[in-house]
Regions:
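PLP-dependent class I/II
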Residues: 1, 6, 10-13, 17-285
Length: 285
């Protein structure tokens, strides 16, 4: 049967309890909104936050749908290249991209497609910079933390961003952590320390209704409630990572070993990456 539009109360309470236990961070069930996965979480969050003409900063390389989600919400997308070769955030370049129109920056760590995990020092520097820019412009700037790969780390610490920066919105999906891609279940979490957290949560609820994301699948809500603290065994992913990275670099390809997720971001050996990909497809590589 249907749950409430924002999700079953008991399910949200279990998720809030898990956040508090795992990360040592206070979470209120009444600021958690169940969604049809991370894509819905991002779409709803962006539509709740964005006014036409607002700017969204996206570190590059990035999951291509971010641009679609942001522009569909009426935002202007501003991309900032990550630092090479480690693909950590370039804090100075990000600071230069912030304007009085900046509403949010999307942070995806572990990252799709690079596999980079943004370090605690990186997140602390980002937080300090955004606090400074908020004070300079007298505006609220949010971090939208897209976290479907949070549990897929090969030993690198994955900072829990709300502990570093109050104006954070968590967009979480269980599809990767529970190996349930396609089951479409996740949540939005707004910390109580975020600016106008209750109004923002009301906007999230309203955006969910307007976009047709009313009541995430009930069966999957009850399923994840029994798995809130389940962590994946990443040993198979790590074995594949080591095998592919070793073989490809032995062949002369350039790549950085990913610290998380399950992607290997390989530099094209030709100037035209699309042309190289077409050749690779031809030979079934």
């Amino acid at each position: 049967s249907y749950t409430s539009a924002q999700g079953d109360t008991a399910v949200r309470a279990k998720i809030a309890g898990s956040i508090e236990e795992r990360f040592g961070f206070p979470a209120n069930k009444d600021l958690i909104y169940m969604t049809c996965g991370a894509a819905a979480s991002l779409t709803v969050t962006l539509n709740a936050l964005i006014n036409s003409g607002d700017e969204i900063i996206i570190p590059s390389p990035f999951f291509p749908e971010y641009r679609v989600f942001a522009e569909n919400a009426g935002a202007r997308v501003v991309t900032v290249q990550c630092r090479k070769p480690d693909f950590q955030l370039d804090i100075k370049a990000t600071e230069n991209a912030v304007t009085e129109k900046t509403k949010a920056i999307i942070i995806n760590s572990p990252n799709n497609p690079t596999g980079a995990v943004f370090s605690p020092d990186t997140i602390k520097a980002l937080s300090d910079m955004l606090c400074k820019k908020q004070a300079e412009y007298g505006t609220d700037i949010y971090i939208i933390a897209d976290e479907p790969y949070r549990e897929l780390s090969y030993g690198a610490e994955v900072p829990y961003i709300p502990k570093y920066y109050a104006n954070t919105v968590i967009c979480y999906s269980y599809s990767k952590s529970l190996s349930l891609p396609g089951e479409r279940i996740g949540y939005i979490f707004i910390p109580e320390g975020a600016a106008d957290c209750r109004k923002l949560y009301a906007a999230v609820c309203g955006a969910g209704r307007a976009l047709g994301f009313v009541c995430a699948p009930s069966l999957m809500q009850y399923t994840v409630a029994e798995c809130t603290d389940a962590l994946p065994d990443v040993s198979a992913y790590k074995k594949n990572r080591d095998l592919l990275f070793g073989a490809l670099t032995d062949y002369g390809y350039e790549a950085v070993p990913p610290d998380g997720a399950f992607y290997l971001f390989v530099k094209s050996p030709e100037p035209d990456a699309n042309a190289f990909c077409e050749k690779a497809k031809k030979y079934e590589l």
